[in-house]
Structures are given as C-alpha cells and as structure tokens.
Amino acid sequence: YSSAASDVYKRQVSEHTMCVEKDENKMAFLIREHILALLGDHMVSIEEALLESFYILLELYKNQPITPELVEEYFSPETLLQLRTAITQAKSTISSLETWEECNELLQDLAVNYRKEGLYEKFLTPVITQAEYYSQIFGRQGIHVGEDMDATKGENEAGQLWDRWRQFRNAFASYELLLRNFLRNEVFSDLILPENFEMEPEEADNLEHMVLQMQWIAIAYAVIRQSLFLKWSLDADGIPAEEALDYETVREYMVVISRMTGYEDEDIRGYLENSFAELIWDWGYFALII
C-alpha cells in the first residue's frame, strides 16, 4: 500500500518507549472505543472509517509491544488527518469496478456451502444467479472489469455494469445510518476476545484477534453491499434507483449475511486461512474490497 500512508506512523513508532505498561486489557477496550468513535463520526464515510481502523490495527500489530499513549497518538485528530489524506490518495488508485469484481467472488465463495445445504435459498438464489451471470459474461468476453471499464462505458455489459454500480451506490448511501449502526454493533460485540472479561490474554493474541475480526467485518460489509447490488439490479428495471432498494430488502439481506458470517472465532480463522494467501491481509487488499 501507499508509502505515504506508511510514513505517517514512522515518527510515532520511533518515539515509542519500550517501557510498556502491561495493561493489554485496558488497551483492547481503548482501541475498540476509538474504532467505535470513528464509525460513529458522520464527517467520515463508512469506508474511510473502516480503512483507517484497519490501517491502525495493522500498525499496532506490527509494532508490539504498545502503550495506551501510543494508541492515543495513532487515533489523535492530527494523525488521523494525515492518514486520511494518504489513504484517499492510495484508494484513488483502485478502480471501483475492481472492488466490484472481487466482492462478487467473495459473495459466491461465502455462499457455496449454504447453497449446497439449501439454506437461505429465497435470498441467495437470485443474487448468486446474477453474480454467476456477470462472472460468465466477463469470462466469455475476456473483460477484466478493472482494466477495461473506462474503454467500454455504455458499449457492452461491462459499461452497463459501471452505470448501474454508480446508480446503486447513490441508493445504498441512503442507508448509511443503518449500516453504521450494524458495523458499530459488530465491532462492539466481536472485536475483543471474550477472555478479556475474565483475564488478561497476551497482547499479541488481543491484537491478532482484532485484526482478524476487522477482516471478517469487512467481508460481511462487502458481501452485504454486493448482494444488495445484485438484488437491486434485478429489481431496478423501469423504476427509480432509490425505490428499487427498499428498507425491508436492505434489512433482510443484512440479517441473512450476518447469519452466514456468524462463525465462531476458530472457524473464522480457518476460513481466512483456507480462502486467502495470508491469514493477515495487507492493507491494500482490505482497501480493494472496501
């Protein structure tokens, strides 16, 4: 990912004392508090809040041992402002349709076992059929969405998809408050190891758990957005884009995807290990799916 984003933290890390206060319990809750605050800040988009949170978690994970003072510095307004600028520049190099393409694959991968068992058919069958349709179109035409989109606007399936995706994102944005509340609930419920409430686990275990849970939350968010786009694309013909994405549909797909991603911690780790080249992603991949 962007070296500019990486440079933001060099000063903090170089000044970091090794006289670490061993209060991992306190720091886990402190980190969660800051991430909840980011997701609750309506001046920061949902995507920006997720990207910033994951970047900081990665930095904390890489620079153990950490102190509460270092955590506070990472989440300070000055540092966040610098990070936001760097992330905006880095994110601008990723095509939104590359994001679409990757999320289309994530949705299909996540749904495989549920479809085999005949679960959630009412919700999954239409959107997975649509997802597979797009995958076949791009494969048959040799179109890679991210690379070829600009050259094909309005001229073929890929160009039509680009137009639809932009329309959908406008409709999707009207449910920002609902999505923020969902993500804040996921962070509050899942970001901290249950052991924190009974004992103090090792700092490394805490931070790794936080990173993995943030990856899992990102998958859930990306798959909710993708499934809603595919459902919307089936329903939007002949009616205004906003009307085709109603509250009940959004809520229903959020509930279904939440159930589909409601894994135990060990199962989440297993899924990530089996589905990705590295257990812990680099920031660039997180940015790709967000």
Name what the model sees in each region.
Residues 1-5, 9-12:
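Single conserved hydrophobic/aromatic residue that forms the stacking wall/gate
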Residues 42-290:
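Hydrophobic, aromatic-lined core segments that form the binding pocket/scaffold
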